[in-house]
UniProtKB/Swiss-Prot annotation:
Binds 1 pyridoxal phosphate per subunit. Disulfide bonds: none annotated. The gene is serC. It comes from Hamiltonella defensa subsp. Acyrthosiphon pisum (strain 5AT). Pathway: Amino-acid biosynthesis; L-serine biosynthesis; L-serine from 3-phospho-D-glycerate: step 2/3; Cofactor biosynthesis; pyridoxine 5'-phosphate biosynthesis; pyridoxine 5'-phosphate from D-erythrose 4-phosphate: step 3/5. This is Phosphoserine aminotransferase. It is found in: Cytoplasm.
Amino acid sequence: MPLIYNFSAGPAMLPAEVVFQAEQELAERKKKGISVMEISHRSEFFQKIAKESEQDLKDLLNIPSNYKVLFCQGGARGQFAAVPMNLLGEKKTADYITGGYWSKSAILEAKKYGVPNIIDASVRKPISGVFFQSIKPISEWQLSEDAAYVHYCPNETIEGIAIHAPPIFSHHKDVVADFSSSILSCPIDVDRYGVIYAGAQKNIGPAGLTVVIVRDDLLGKAHQHTPSILNYQVLADTQSMFNTPPTFAWYLSGLVFKWLKDQGGLIEIQKRNREKAQLLYSTIDENEFYLNQVAPTHRSLMNVPFSLSTSTPRLDELFLSEAKKRGLEGLKGHRAATGMRASIYNAMPVEGVQKLTEFMVEFARRYG
């Protein structure tokens, strides 16, 4: 069976080496009588998996010692609620930067617990007579004086917009970031953040796990009505095992962390990701048949949306069906958008992007 390249925004491809290792270890059930999917999270065997995976993640991101790593459930949407419940404290407001769909979704949830100060950072920027989506410089974000924290999403998966600049503000702010679609794609200066959270299903592992990295001094501030399963202090005190965690997703994520270390770490991964993105964006920009409407300075390295210049529902469906015949799947854009989207996370090999761009050139030649 030929390899299928999955360009879906998530769940995404897993590294082939990780899938093979998991297959081998599951096959050992015949010898051991039990598999990693069946063991207790309290067992010595799984405790070793949990500790190793946490340490490997700390090594990859160079996480300082005054941060806790939590392995949770509920996805990023769960964190949209957990963040204000844990961090607002006695304050009533927090700064929320909007740049796309997911940051707006975080705001909708935050409104249940406080009054978010909404800063619209999106802007349409003219380049050679054409307007492109972009993001205002961080220096122009009008933050409030009394906000408990500032929340933003460095990579918007639907629009394909990224905020590459680090969050440096003129006065101290606890910064909270939704890194769901870009975590582990490049080095992160963790100590610039109070909280980092990410759903696993893009760059970490399979769906079902959520990683939260929280600075120690932000623990113990949760509202009294915060559900225990979302309370950072409770999760930290119980080593992320207040309830039964998604053990198999945690185990597979641990294998991904080891794979990333074996590849040379995040500097090497970032180099590969830039190579893949450059190949895809160049194909789009050099061919009038395709269009990406994000300013080059804010293009995502993970999610590349594009449309056909002569787009019709029939032509779009033809593009998707012919791509699927070539083992290129998951290219349909999000339901809230139109056109196509290629998500090229860490596990997507450069060969997959090469195969996609070759198909795109061929399709444009035939139908352009």
